[in-house]
């Protein structure tokens, strides 16, 4: 008997359009698997209203024709469309960035008591926050590039002091990032003090906390990880960027892989770097209490050859050019099998949590 799966995509997020592309890929795979009854839920970018669609269209323009049935949720009671209850066995969120990767939707699904694909509340919330993620990884002696972080209110009160810290502790050039955002949105490289204020202000347009890191010329390595208690680390891949300073939003989603961008799977690594990447991927996954899946990004300095953990993505891209599925496929796990495995992991994680915690014993 087929399981009822709810695929949630879109979202009130700067990465809304990327989510649509990822959802289309996953939906197509679910149809090929023919193991699940798929309920496609589109979350409007402006209103945040949830709509039940007949399918996941291949383009954003087609969605508007189908957004008629509004989805309502009542924790403890169920999910409803047109006053009819939907019996959902598992939820697959593919909302990138805010509300999707920050623990919000994970908390909601937990309240609904439904298995959920991917990381839980804690792992999601920490991983998406670049500042706290780096602080935590550094505390476990996992190498990260030198950085400082600050909130908007603190910057307003002590702008010159923070700019002085950037100059003294990091030295230029530096890379300026919104703390909670993905897909390289709002990220800029500042080469001198005259640029830093402009880029900090731009980053604050996306988030209330900004992270400034020492910019290094680096190789960009990505590593796919799946699993719960037992994890599998796939062969790392490398993104070789020719015409961009780093792998920014335009490079990721506005450029067709070719001369400007080359995906090398496997990445050309010496044995030490390969082993270190797999070790740090394992430790990062463990310390952040991740489950389901993650893409862990690394930097290898072209000057010093030193390795750093850069960022952690708990809902990596599933578009036709995304590295996560490509790395899995290189090691023999097809796109469809990957999607199916992630759903299985969601059921396993849910069952373990339910078996481990017996709330009835607290009753008097």
Swiss-Prot record:
This is D-alanine--D-alanine ligase. Mg(2+) 1 binds at residues 297, 311. Its cofactor is Mg(2+); Mn(2+). InterPro entries: ATP-grasp, ATP_grasp_subdomain_1, D-Ala_lig_Van_CS, D_ala_D_ala, Dala_Dala_lig_C, Dala_Dala_lig_N, PreATP-grasp_dom_sf. PROSITE patterns: ATP_GRASP, DALA_DALA_LIGASE_1, DALA_DALA_LIGASE_2. Mg(2+) 2 binds at residues 311, 313. Residues 134-344 form the ATP-grasp domain. The gene is ddl. Cell wall formation. Pathway: Cell wall biogenesis; peptidoglycan biosynthesis. It catalyses: 2 D-alanine + ATP = D-alanyl-D-alanine + ADP + phosphate + H(+). GO terms for biological process: cell wall organization; peptidoglycan biosynthetic process; regulation of cell shape. GO terms for molecular function: ATP binding; D-alanine-D-alanine ligase activity; metal ion binding. Gene3D superfamilies: 3.40.50.20, ATP-grasp fold, A domain, ATP-grasp fold, B domain. Binds 2 magnesium or manganese ions per subunit. The keyword Ligase applies. Its EC number is 6.3.2.4. Belongs to the D-alanine--D-alanine ligase family. ATP binds at residues 167-222. It is found in: Cytoplasm. Its main location: cytoplasm. Keywords: ATP-binding, Cell shape, Cell wall biogenesis/degradation, Cytoplasm, Ligase, Magnesium, Manganese, Metal-binding, Nucleotide-binding, Peptidoglycan synthesis. GO terms for cellular component: cytosol.
């Amino acid at each position: 008997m087929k399981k009822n799966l709810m695929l949630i995509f879109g979202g009130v997020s700067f990465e809304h359009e990327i989510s649509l592309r990822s959802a289309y890929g996953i939906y197509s795979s679910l149809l090929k698997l023919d193991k699940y009854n798929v309920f496609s839920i589109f979350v409007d970018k402006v209103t945040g209203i949830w709509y039940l669609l007949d399918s996941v269209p291949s383009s954003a323009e087609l969605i508007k024709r189908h957004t008629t049935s509004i989805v309502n949720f009542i924790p403890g009671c169920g999910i409803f469309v047109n006053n009819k209850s939907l019996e959902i066995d598992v939820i697959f969120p593919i909302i990138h960035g805010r509300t999707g990767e920050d623990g919000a939707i994970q908390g909601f699904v937990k309240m609904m008591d439904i298995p959920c694909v991917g990381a839980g509340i804690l792992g999601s919330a920490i991983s998406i926050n670049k500042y706290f993620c780096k602080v935590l990884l550094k505390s476990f002696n996992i190498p990260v590039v030198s950085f400082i972080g600050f909130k908007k209110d603190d910057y307003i009160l002590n702008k010159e002091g923070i700019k002085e810290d950037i100059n003294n502790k990091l030295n230029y050039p530096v890379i300026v990032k919104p703390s909670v955002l993905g897909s390289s949105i709002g990220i800029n490289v500042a080469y001198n003090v005259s640029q830093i204020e402009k880029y900090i202000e731009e980053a604050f347009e996306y988030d209330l906390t900004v992270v400034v890191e020492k910019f290094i010329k680096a190789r960009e390595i990505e590593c796919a990880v799946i699993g719960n208690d037992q994890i599998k680390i796939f062969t790392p891949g490398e993104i070789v960027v020719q015409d961009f300073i780093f792998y920014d939003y335009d490079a990721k989603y506005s450029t067709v892989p070719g001369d400007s961008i080359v995906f090398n799977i496997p990445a050309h690594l010496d044995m030490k770097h390969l082993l270190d990447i797999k070790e740090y991927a394992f430790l990062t996954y463990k310390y952040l209490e991740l489950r389901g899946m993650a893409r862990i990004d690394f930097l290898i300095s072209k000057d010093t050859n030193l390795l750093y953990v850069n960022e952690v993505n708990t809902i990596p891209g599933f578009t036709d050019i995304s590295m996560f599925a490509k790395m899995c496929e290189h090691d023999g796990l097809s796109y469809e099998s990957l999607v199916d495995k992630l759903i299985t992991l969601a059921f396993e994680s849910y069952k373990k949590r339910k078996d481990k915690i017996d709330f009835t014993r607290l009753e008097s």
